[in-house]
Amino acid sequence: MKAIYEGKAKALFETEEAGVLRVYYKDDATAFNGEKKESIDGKGILNNAITTQLFELMHDNKIPTHFIKQISDREQLVRRVDIIPLEVVVRNVAAGSLAKRLGWEEGTPLLAPIVEFYYKDDALGDPLLTEDHIRLLQVATHKEVETLRQLGLWVNDVLLDFFGQHGIDVIDFKLEFGKVDGTIILADEISPDTCRLWDKETKQKLDKDVFRRDLGSLTETYGQLLTRIGGNGQ
């Protein structure tokens, strides 16, 4: 069956049930807007398992998501959504582009979590947007932006508590949202592809920065993370 959409890390397929899609997690790893690419055996299986566990965690905390269930080691069933073309980034610690933009040392704690919005457009390099830009682009209303902000901070609270129990700091993460019948829900994935996660004591990176910065084996790192949070693949 032909994918109705194929991105850098996942492919989406129709199912026989209206409003339900099948997500296939690929082994492709990319960084720097696709400039660095590699196929890493087993990556998709690990991301599927981790995302499944974290979406189930969101459900337990009453956060609405598109996730229905995991159906194989690489696949999930999800609700079909109309994606909002914004990436919602929540940051607790200065790292990556924020550290570079502010001239801060990576690892500097923020006084409070901040929420940033980026335009989902690969051709433009997913630029950082202000709320004025969002209004000009007409991709979300002021009310929707506030909903995205509050949902992002809610997810942050849940992740901070969960990973904190496993000795892991949540540095920052990227979320995507969509609409179902006008209601905004969490979509895409939550995985070490989309989060920065550091060991609390050693500051070891447990995320895609291992691939970005050639710090070691991505599958070993993701497998270690999955084991630490008590998850398992199918």
Swiss-Prot record:
Record EC number: 6.3.2.6
Keywords: ATP-binding, Ligase, Nucleotide-binding, Purine biosynthesis
InterPro entries: SAICAR_synt/ADE2_N, SAICAR_synt_PurC, SAICAR_synth, SAICAR_synthetase, SAICAR_synthetase_CS
Reaction catalysis annotation: 5-amino-1-(5-phospho-D-ribosyl)imidazole-4-carboxylate + L-aspartate + ATP = (2S)-2-[5-amino-1-(5-phospho-beta-D-ribosyl)imidazole-4-carboxamido]succinate + ADP + phosphate + 2 H(+)
UniProt enzyme class: ligase
Molecular function terms, GO-annotated: ATP binding; phosphoribosylaminoimidazolesuccinocarboxamide synthase activity
Pathway(s) it belongs to: Purine metabolism; IMP biosynthesis via de novo pathway; 5-amino-1-(5-phospho-D-ribosyl)imidazole-4-carboxamide from 5-amino-1-(5-phospho-D-ribosyl)imidazole-4-carboxylate: step 1/2
Regions annotated as coiled coil: none
Any single biological process term in GO: 'de novo' IMP biosynthetic process
Domain of life (superkingdom): Bacteria
NCBIfam families in UniProt: purC
Similarity field: Belongs to the SAICAR synthetase family.
Protein name: Phosphoribosylaminoimidazole-succinocarboxamide synthase
Organism: Exiguobacterium sp. (strain ATCC BAA-1283 / AT1b)
Lineage: Bacteria, Bacillati, Bacillota, Bacilli, Bacillales
